[in-house]
């Protein structure tokens, strides 16, 4: 056998032995609580479709209309000929959406949140900059920090005292603090008011990845900035549009000069084909729903389900992490046990993924339960009952 292939197969076997190999399941229906998976009807608690908009009829109609207006693809990068009227209108609407939190805001649309985060960190920092990164940040922020060529220092999760010491010791002209808003595997919120105060005190950017807060948090769904009533020119905000917004892509919002600099220097924006204009067209409808009465109703229902879950779930040995967001992790511990529990739920036609290292620390393998406004109270009750029964049997 080829030596290179043999080496890979040996490493794959090691993943199997540690219960760490990831496997894909194939869905055959729209994203929803009731979904067809590999030919099987399942109740899903694993998507990030927090407001239940991924299969919303109005958004589907808008996507189809966008394809009729603009075709299937953009055909080029934004700086050549791929920047359509739909992209421009979406960026204008996104800037208006976050304007209460960021003065003189502009927005820039990206194909993915991963690309947006790498673009921010590579364009706004660089050699000679000091970049302070939260220890539980998303992989895209970690990779962006590595690619930035900045001096990267990681501070412990939620340790503002340590961060304050690091900022005070920095002599760099360009300083940047980078954090998730809602931590994707724990569900807790960063202390953003205190983080922003530190950044303003020390003249640092505060980069906020609000992947799991945009659309969900705040009275109008404007995310964590609205939730905490934050407003500052030091803010650089990233929101994803494939989670609560139900479609695809991401955006960066900041002071207009920040965005103009990114247009000139952000390689993940410059050197890639623009997303299909039809997607941007559909997102205009999504934003309308998020910011309107229907969005408010969906957020209220989601909060009711979160409260129901936290009140009803009673565990003896497993640990439900303290979270007031749609992400509700249940820490099991060992990889093989977490996999066994996920498989047992699957046999009951309940789909909850087991999350293992390196995504989470060793010994903290967990079930990552995500709730959606599309779920019902009865479905949450079903999952609670199944989990409690499995814990007693384990």
Curated annotation (Swiss-Prot):
Entry's family note: Belongs to the class-II pyridoxal-phosphate-dependent aminotransferase family. BioF subfamily.
Enzyme Commission number, as recorded: 2.3.1.47
Pathway: Cofactor biosynthesis; biotin biosynthesis
Subunit structure: Homodimer.
Main EC class the enzyme belongs to: transferase
InterPro entries (alphabetical): Aminotransferase_I/II_large (IPR004839), AON_synthase_class-II (IPR050087), AONS_Archaea/Proteobacteria (IPR004723), AONS_Proteobacteria (IPR022834), PyrdxlP-dep_Trfase (IPR015424), PyrdxlP-dep_Trfase_major (IPR015421), PyrdxlP-dep_Trfase_small (IPR015422)
Catalysed transformations (reactions): 6-carboxyhexanoyl-[ACP] + L-alanine + H(+) = (8S)-8-amino-7-oxononanoate + holo-[ACP] + CO2
GO molecular function per UniProt: 8-amino-7-oxononanoate synthase activity; pyridoxal phosphate binding
Gene3D superfamilies linked to this entry: Aspartate Aminotransferase, domain 1, Type I PLP-dependent aspartate aminotransferase-like (Major domain)
Pfam name, any one: Aminotran_1_2
List of residues binding pyridoxal 5'-phosphate: 113-114, 184, 212, 240
Keywords: Biotin biosynthesis, Pyridoxal phosphate, Transferase
Binding residues annotated for substrate, in chain numbering: 22, 138, 359
Residue positions where N6-(pyridoxal phosphate)lysine is found in the record: 243
Family matches, as SUPFAM superfamilies: PLP-dependent transferases
NCBIfam families referenced in this protein's UniProt entry, alphabetically: bioF
Function: Catalyzes the decarboxylative condensation of pimeloyl-[acyl-carrier protein] and L-alanine to produce 8-amino-7-oxononanoate (AON), [acyl-carrier protein], and carbon dioxide.
GO terms, biological process: biotin biosynthetic process
Protein name (Swiss-Prot/TrEMBL): 8-amino-7-oxononanoate synthase
Cofactor: pyridoxal 5'-phosphate
């Amino acid at each position: 056998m080829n030596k290179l292939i043999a080496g890979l197969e040996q490493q794959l076997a090691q993943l199997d032995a540690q219960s760490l190999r990831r496997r894909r399941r194939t869905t055959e229906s729209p994203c929803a609580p009731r979904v067809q998976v590999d030919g099987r009807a399942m109740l899903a608690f694993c998507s990030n479709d927090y407001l239940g908009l991924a299969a919303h009829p109005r958004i589907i109609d808008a996507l189809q209309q966008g394809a009729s207006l603009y075709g299937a693809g953009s055909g080029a990068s934004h700086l050549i000929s791929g920047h359509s009227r739909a992209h421009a209108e979406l960026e204008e609407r996104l800037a208006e959406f976050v304007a209460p939190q960021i003065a003189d805001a502009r927005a820039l649309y990206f194909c993915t949140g991963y690309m947006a985060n790498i673009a921010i960190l590579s364009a706004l920092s660089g050699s000679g900059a000091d970049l302070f990164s939260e220890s539980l940040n998303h992989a895209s922020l970690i990779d962006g920090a590595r690619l930035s060529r900045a001096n990267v220092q990681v501070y412990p999760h939620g340790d503002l005292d340590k961060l304050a010491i690091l900022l005070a010791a920095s002599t760099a002209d360009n300083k940047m603090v980078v954090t998730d808003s809602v931590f994707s595997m724990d569900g807790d919120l960063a202390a953003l008011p205190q983080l922003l105060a530190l950044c303003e005190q020390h003249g640092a950017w505060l980069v906020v990845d609000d992947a799991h807060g945009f659309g969900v948090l705040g009275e109008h769904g404007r995310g964590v900035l609205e939730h905490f009533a934050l407003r500052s020119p030091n803010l650089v905000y990233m929101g994803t549009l494939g989670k609560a917004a139900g479609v695809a892509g991401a955006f960066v919002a900041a002071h207009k000069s920040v965005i103009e600099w990114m247009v000139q220097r952000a390689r993940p924006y410059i050197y890639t084909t623009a997303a299909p204009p039809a997607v941007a067209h559909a997102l205009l409808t999504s934003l309308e729903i998020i910011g309107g009465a229907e969005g408010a109703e969906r957020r209220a229902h989601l909060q009711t389900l979160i409260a129901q879950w936290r009140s009803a779930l009673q565990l003896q040995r497993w640990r439900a992490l303290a979270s007031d967001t749609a992400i509700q992790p249940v820490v099991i511990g060992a990889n093989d046990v977490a996999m066994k529990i996920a498989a047992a739920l699957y046999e009951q036609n309940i789909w909850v993924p087991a999350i293992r290292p390196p995504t989470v620390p060793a010994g903290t393998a967990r079930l990552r339960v995500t709730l959606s406004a599309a779920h019902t109270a009865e479905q949450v009750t079903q999952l609670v009952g199944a989990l409690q029964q499995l814990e007693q049997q384990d």
